[in-house]
């Protein structure tokens, strides 16, 4: 909505609000979202409490399989029926956020929505349904143990 579009994200970018949940050549994009230093808080702050219905969050789960081991056939055929002993092992995508927290600043204090150190999900659609003063996302690590974590979408209605 308009509120999300017009509210800046501290340490973030409007690329998180453009509706693209993955790079797609149909949209003319080769990349989307932003990469943030682990431990950096991405915060929406409001001048007064605003009613938020839902929050949408999408991390990079390497749908293009660029970080998987092996050659193209190994990366593109995820449901192999014949697995050789020397076949590359599949694992959680290295680009996926592993540890993060999501909290709301409410008139009565901070409300933790998600605080996980073993995330396996690419996308979240979270019902909020309350008036909040701020929304804060902090990615702490990813499965590839790099210094930055890529976030594709972080918006609300």
Residues covered by each model-derived region:
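Predominantly extracellular/luminal regions of secreted and cell-surface proteins
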Residues: 1-21
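Aromatic, loop-rich ligand-recognition surfaces of beta-strand-rich domains
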Residues: 22-110, 118-157
